[in-house]
Structures are given as structure tokens and as C-alpha cells.
């Protein structure tokens, strides 16, 4: 990648409140002044959010300052789709993805590192076990847990940034396509939680995966942690079947419920970060990719549809409509 000169563009985001009094979602305006914007990833670093953006001109790295300022830190003419990103406390690490080379798109085994303070982008000497775009990653226990597809079989690796080394874990991994969970995995309380595929699952580095609930097959949800809960937003069970639902999960009690508020437009492939509010960036809708930032007041919302877990092993779920 050959970065262009640094762009410092402060974008004022206009607040356009929704008209439904019962809705808790506010539109903060455009992500960028572009005809098409793809949001490849988001990571939270203390009080700031970093985003990987794709446009017709290439790739940009942006910094979002809640509540309403976005700044482009670095732009490149590189055309690539890299979505598996984590924050390691100092840098953003980005794993695999798809790159445009020699007139075609191909999977890559590259690991990129972006330092927002130094505005420096580099390719690490280490690389994934094989080129793939079917990959998800999460930061936990001072390492990166990487879930990738190897010949239709999910494998789990631990990556240690301090010495750029890998260790393959001897654990189960029932996720069919980790890349479909790339924005749907979060770390909380010593475990990774997945909200994709056949339902909700937890991953313990020592014990592997455990299904918590089986739901409809939904991919590309946006998941984030906020106030001790995990929220899963939108998703898709097919390109034409995007979701507008917001689901809240309590990892301490196992309570799973659907929130009253719906997305103003159904979408999958969005990214989300939690804090005082949950910020939702981009996503794919029936009208194409959404060039929009949404702010969700989750504390002002409430559950209207609790999902009743049937037994300790949890093989199915049953909506319990009307339970408050």
C-alpha cells in the first residue's frame, strides 16, 4: 500500500432525529461526502472509534469522536476488502481479506498494522496460515483469537502481537463461515460471543465452543458490548432478507430478548461500537450501502420479546411474546 498525503478532514455531522417518539435511534448524518461508502471495520480505543472505509477512490482510515466529529487520518488508492480488525491497545491489527491485484480480486494472508497516533500503515512479517477472506478476529487475554475457514473447516488460532507468533488451538469450531461473523463476535468476561449463523455461541479458549441458543440463520449482524450487555443489530439471512431487529443478551444470566426499537431501515454488514450510546456505521440495505451513522439510546429502550431458553443445553428457542 502506498498511502497518499495525510488528509485531515473534519466533518460536521448533522443531527436528524427520527419522528417516532418511541424510537431511540438518531441519525447523525453521512459518514463521508462520497457517493458510495463501505464500512469494513470498526474498533473502539478508549473514547474514540477507528473505522476502515472503502470508497470508489480506495481505502481510508478514519477517527470518530463522539458525539459528532469524524476525521480522515490516512487514505490510500489500494482497493481491498479487509474486515477482521482488532485494537491491541496501541495499534489496529487487520487480518486477511480480499485485495485487488493484477486485474482481479484475490484472498490475502497479509496482516496489516495501523498506528493512528503515528498515522503509519505497515504489513507485518507474520501472515495467516493461508490466504482467506473467510476470517473473524477478536482481542482477549492480551492476544488475538482468529477464526478462519480452511477447506470448509473452521480453525482457531491465537496470535501474539509482541513477537508476531501463532499457536493453533485444539478446540472445536462449529462456525461454517467465520467471515460471516466478522462483525458479530465480541469479547466479554473471558469469553468470545458469536451472534451469527445458527444462533448465539460462546467460545472459551480452554473448552472451545458452546451453543447458547439456536435461532434463525442470520449472518453479518453488528455486535457490541455496552453496559454489561451484548447487543446484536440487524443482519441478513440473504442479500434480499436484511433484518431490522436489535437483540440484547445478558452474558451473566443468559437472558436473550428483542428490543422495542427497530432500525429505521433493515441492514446487514453494519458495524457497531458501544459506550454511553451505541453508534452504528454503514451497512447494506435494500437501497445499497448506507452512508450513515446512527446513534442508539439503548438505556432508554426496553425488551418487548423475551426469548425463553428451553433447557440448560439450549437446542432451540421460543419467543415469549408479551412478557415484560
Curated annotation (Swiss-Prot):
Pfam families per the UniProt record, alphabetical: Kelch_1
UniProt cross-references to InterPro entries, sorted A to Z: Kelch-typ_b-propeller (IPR015915), Kelch_1 (IPR006652)
Keywords: Kelch repeat, Repeat
Start and stop residues of the Kelch repeats: 229-276, 277-323
Repeat as UniProt keyword: yes
Keyword Repeat listed: yes
The name this protein goes by in its record: Kelch domain-containing protein AF_2170
